[in-house]
Regions:
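Classical Sec-dependent N-terminal signal peptides that target proteins to the secretory pathway
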Residues: 1-33
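N-terminal alpha-helical modules
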Residues: 32-237
Length: 237
C-alpha cells in the first residue's frame, strides 16, 4: 500500500483528501529534490534509496493521524518525514561526513518549515487584526505618546529578527563550545556531530514554536508566552 493510499484512508471527506494529499505531495516533491542531490553526491545505491523511502513511509504512519485536525496532520507528517530521513540517511551514509550531510539536510528542510509557518502565523495574525502599536502595552511608559491611528512597530517581524540574531549567536557559541570540548578531550569527530545536532535542535524548537502559535491563533485567537532553553516564565528550569 503506497503512502497516498494510506492518506486517503486517514481522511474521511473528498475535500480533506484533496487538500491533505496536495499539501503532502508538494512537501515530498521539494524534499525528494534535495534528497536526490544528496544521493547523487554520496553515490547512494537505488536499493538504499528505496530502503529509506520505505522506512519513512512506515514511520510517518506510526501515529494515528485521524484524530488530529488537517493542519496538525500535515505538520506531524512533515516533521516525522524529515526526522526519519535524517536518521536513516545517517545510517546509510555511515561516515562522519555522511552523518553531518544528513544533519545539514535536516537543517535545510526545517528551515523551509520555519519560513512556511512564520508566513502562515503572520498571515493569521494580520487576518485577526492582532497587531499592536509599539508602546501600547500597560507596562510601557510611552503609552500616552501613541497618537490615534499611528502605525506602530511590527512586533512579530521584530521578534523574528531578534530570534535570527539569537540563532546566529547560539550557533557561534556552539562552534566555540565544540572547539573547547574538542581541545579538552584531545580530538574526536563525534563532537562535530554533536554540534550539528545542537544547531538542528535549536531550529526545530523555533519551528515547533511558530506552528504551535499558528494553531493557537486559529483555534483560540491568542497565544501563550513561550519559554526558551527549557526555562519557565518564573525562571525555574
Amino acid at each position: 500500500m503506497n503512502i497516498f493510499t494510506r492518506l486517503f484512508k486517514v481522511s474521511t471527506t473528498g475535500t480533506k483528501i484533496k487538500i491533505l494529499a496536495f499539501a503532502i505531495f508538494a512537501n515530498i516533491a521539494f524534499a525528494n529534490e534535495s534528497l536526490q542531490k544528496l544521493f547523487k553526491e554520496y553515490n547512494v545505491s537505488k536499493d538504499k534509496q528505496e530502503y529509506i523511502n520505505k522506512e519513512c513511509n512506515k514511520e510517518v504512519f506510526k501515529d494515528n493521524f485521524k484524530d488530529l485536525s488537517k493542519i496538525e496532520q500535515i505538520y506531524k507528517f512533515e516533521v516525522a518525514r524529515i526526522d526519519c530521513e535524517v536518521n536513516n540517511l545517517g545510517e546509510v551514509l555511515g561516515s562522519t561526513q555522511g552523518i553531518l550531510a544528513s544533519l545539514n539536510y535536516g537543517y535545510d528542510e526545517y528551515d523551509k518549515l520555519l519560513n512556511k509557518y512564520y508566513k502562515l502565523y503572520r498571515a493569521e495574525v494580520k487576518k485577526q487584526n492582532k497587531t499592536t502599536p509599539t508602546g501600547a502595552f500597560s507596562h510601557e511608559p510611552n503609552i500616552q505618546n501613541i497618537k490615534k491611528g499611528q502605525k506602530g512597530q511590527d512586533t512579530l517581524l521584530e521578534e523574528q529578527r531578534a530570534w535570527l540574531k539569537l540563532r546566529d549567536s547560539y550557533e557561534a557559541y556552539i562552534r566555540k563550545h565544540h572547539a573547547h570540548i574538542y581541545d579538552i578531550n584531545g580530538g574526536g569527530t563525534i563532537y562535530s556531530i554533536h554540534t550539528s545536532n545542537a544547531r538542528l535542535g535549536f531550529l526545530k524548537m523555533r519551528v515547533n514554536e511558530l506552528f504551535s502559535r499558528y494553531l493557537m491563533m486559529i483555534t483560540d485567537g491568542g497565544v501563550e508566552f513561550d519559554s526558551i532553553f527549557g526555562s519557565n516564565v518564573d525562571g525555574d528550569i
